[in-house]
């Protein structure tokens, strides 16, 4: 196998086998198998981990066509019969003539995967006892606690000739054998699984794009490679691979929809590693031409008519503030609750609070950090763990930003005294491990926020709902089910409403149990699903003084009727846990919606509202996000507030600060960056 390079220059000189990587919190993965393992390791996997903010070293030990018995025999003999490769800081280097013992000693491996070719992996007799012997060998030579994972291979493509006759030239039959055998021996030997075979079959069965997945018996370099990398990433880290499809866009797979398809199939494979998931929707495949690829052409936006926020359901015009606040506002809230997000409960009896940590010298003395448990009732079974940073030295209660985080409180800052979830929480959320401390600190520029005199408050989304399609069994939802209830009713709350409900519980604490933050000067803020949450929380709870949405897209600030980028169908196919079941009626049927997202923005009136978009985030429909502000403007004008200074969508980096309305279009992709925060802080200086 030829020497390869992924990203940087190849390392040609190294002491011993290779220079060991010295990266804090690095995950070290060693794949033992044949060229298939090497294919996965040396293509997109390293870049996928790095894009997710997870430093990684990837090694692979290759012996062509070896079954487990031969691998075990070679290991026991110490014969230097393997090719050993390693990816460090993006560089791939290889060396022939290495023993398995040498490779195992080269790094303190966190994960070791085991793999053999599919034709052998389909039959139990080719696995036992060789696999058991190999497992014992590896466990004796690796640190205690190393994770052993079975690398589930994929069925061959139809044009393959390798061992193909034995399976009747039917890759579905071959997959069933692979899945059944892998289920049995992972159970027998207590191995975790990297279910690449299931990912590949998900792609084949759901999208009928064989040439984009495999060629003969090998993965191709487009969707197949991307999907395999997504599978390894989610299986090893426990983080949702779908969250990186905007951020990681290699030139081999520039089409966003295909990246999303690949990551989605990987995600469902990790949820059901031994069972194919068919993700076809409606009459065609999700993302196929039959179902409709996302539209990114403004000339193809269909003609549509928006519902008027200032017209009652019975057609009566709204002409006064009293009429808006006394009648129409309640109508719109009812429609959003019933048809889109679902109804949330009121606060529960017995809600109370407990400060469990205080650090008066956080962020180098800039702030006092606290952790507060917001218990939902007297039982103390369920709670939000709120983390707060309040600037030191103020002579008044601080204004604040409340932002739900998606990766755990510890991901916000490098401070190792920030609490991690306990073992039971990790189990409930189906997570194998959280990001490193401060891994996503660029999303939360605490020093900038604190220096401007603002407090920053945050909680982890999965304190309310774990954000995967679990049938609402692991979050707050079953905690309030009625006797005999096992699932929300069609108009009851789903994930986004649970997150917004959590924001209101934080506001309860701000009003009732503390004095360092001004509860009358708190803005919700959020990115992506957090942006949807920020708008919905502020729309329902008028105690929030301002709302800021960053790249919130479909179901957030973007007009649904435009069908630009992500649509109602696509968001509910990918994230069915976010919306109430009644919202399913509007898949491919947006014109029947009794509301649209400009009315969500209008519900925040007369309070300040800001929408941030990204020019490269066409999936979120940045123009549609801007138009929600434009079409919410009449409600603000009812209060004598002028809103945006123009109805013309601005160029990138030309922020619009109007009268209690703001908007900007940032260069770049789906993220919340320093440029965004500068605009939000400037806007808050004027209006919060």
Where in this protein do the model-derived segments appear?
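Mobile cap/lid helix-loop segments that gate and shape the active-site cleft of serine hydrolases
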Residues: 549-600, 625-646
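N-terminal pre-domain segments of enzymes
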Residues: 278-343
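C-terminal catalytic histidine-bearing segment of alpha/beta-hydrolase fold enzymes
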Residues: 584, 630-688
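Cap/lid segment of the alpha/beta-hydrolase catalytic domain
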Residues: 404-513, 519, 560-562
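Alpha-helical cap/lid subdomain in secreted, periplasmic
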Residues: 97-222, 234, 243
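Primarily recognizes the serine-hydrolase "nucleophile elbow" in alpha/beta-hydrolase
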Residues: 504-566, 589-590
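Conserved catalytic region of serine esterases and O-acyltransferases that act on ester linkages
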Residues: 25, 216-281, 287
């Amino acid at each position: 196998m030829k020497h390869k390079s992924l990203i940087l220059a190849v390392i040609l000189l190294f002491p011993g086998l290779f220079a060991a990587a010295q990266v804090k919190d690095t995950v070290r993965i060693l794949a033992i198998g044949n060229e298939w393992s090497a294919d996965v390791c040396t293509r997109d996997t390293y870049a996928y981990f790095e894009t997710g903010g997870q430093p990684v070293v990837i090694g692979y030990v290759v012996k062509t066509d070896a079954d487990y018995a031969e691998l075990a025999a070679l290991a026991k003999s110490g014969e230097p019969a393997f090719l050993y490769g390693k990816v460090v800081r993006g560089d791939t280097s290889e060396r022939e003539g290495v023993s398995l013992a040498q490779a195992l000693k080269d790094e303190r491996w966190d994960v070791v995967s085991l793999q053999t070719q599919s034709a052998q992996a389909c039959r139990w007799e080719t696995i036992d006892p060789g696999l058991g012997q190999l497992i014992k060998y590896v466990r004796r030579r690796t640190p205690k606690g190393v994770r052993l994972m079975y690398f589930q291979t994929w069925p061959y493509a139809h044009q393959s000739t390798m061992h193909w006759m034995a399976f009747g030239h039917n890759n579905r039959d071959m997959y069933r054998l692979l899945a059944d055998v892998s289920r049995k021996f992972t159970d027998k030997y207590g191995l975790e699984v990297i279910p690449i075979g299931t990912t590949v079959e998900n792609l084949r069965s759901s999208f009928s794009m064989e040439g984009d997945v495999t060629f003969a018996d090998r993965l191709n370099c487009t969707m197949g490679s991307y999907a395999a990398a997504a599978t390894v990433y989610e299986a090893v880290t426990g983080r949702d691979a779908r969250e990186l499809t905007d951020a990681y866009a290699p030139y081999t797979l520039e089409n966003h929809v295909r990246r999303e398809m690949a990551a989605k199939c990987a995600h469902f494979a990790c949820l059901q590693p031994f069972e194919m998931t068919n993700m076809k929707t409606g009459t065609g495949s999700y993302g196929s031409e039959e179902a409709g690829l996302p539209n990114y052409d403004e000339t193809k936006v269909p003609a549509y008519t928006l519902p008027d926020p200032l017209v009652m359901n019975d057609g009566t015009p709204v002409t006064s503030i009293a009429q808006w606040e006394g009648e129409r506002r309640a109508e719109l809230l009812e429609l959003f609750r019933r048809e889109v997000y679902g109804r949330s409960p009121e606060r529960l009896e017995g809600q109370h609070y407990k400060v469990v940590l205080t650090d008066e010298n956080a962020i180098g003395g800039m702030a006092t950090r606290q952790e507060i448990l917001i218990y939902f009732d007297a039982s103390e079974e369920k709670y939000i763990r709120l983390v707060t940073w309040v600037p030191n030295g103020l002579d008044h209660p601080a204004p604040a930003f409340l932002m739900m985080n998606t990766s755990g409180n510890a991901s916000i800052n490098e401070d190792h005294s920030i609490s991690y979830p306990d073992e039971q929480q990790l189990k409930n959320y189906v997570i194998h491990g959280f990001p490193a401390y401060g891994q996503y600190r660029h999303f939360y520029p605490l020093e900038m926020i604190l220096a401007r005199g603002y407090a920053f408050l945050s909680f982890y989304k999965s304190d309310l709902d774990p954000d995967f399609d679990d049938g609402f069994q692991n979050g707050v939802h079953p905690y309030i089910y009625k006797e005999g209830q096992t699932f929300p009713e069609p108009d009851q709350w789903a994930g986004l409403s649970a997150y917004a409900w959590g924001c209101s519980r934080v506001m309860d604490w701000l009003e009732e149990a503390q004095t360092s933050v001004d509860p009358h000067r708190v803005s919700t803020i959020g990115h992506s699903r957090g942006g949807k949450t920020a708008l919905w929380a502020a729309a329902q709870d008028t105690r929030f003084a301002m709302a800021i949405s960053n790249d919130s897209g479909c179901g957030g600030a973007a007009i649904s009727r435009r069908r630009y980028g992500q649509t109602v169908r696509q968001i509910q196919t990918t994230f069915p846990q976010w919306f109430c079941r009644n919202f399913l009626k509007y898949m491919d049927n947006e014109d029947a919606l009794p509301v649209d997202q400009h009315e969500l923005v209008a519900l925040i009136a007369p309070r300040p509202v800001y929408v941030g978009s990204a020019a490269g985030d066409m999936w979120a429909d940045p123009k549609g996000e801007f138009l929600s502000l434009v079409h919410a403007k009449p409600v603000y004008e009812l209060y004598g507030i002028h809103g945006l200074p123009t109805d013309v969508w601005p160029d990138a980096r030309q922020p619009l600060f109007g009268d209690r309305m703001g908007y900007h279009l940032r260069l770049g992709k789906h993220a919340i960056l320093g440029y965004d925060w500068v605009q939000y802080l400037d806007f808050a200086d004027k209006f919060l």
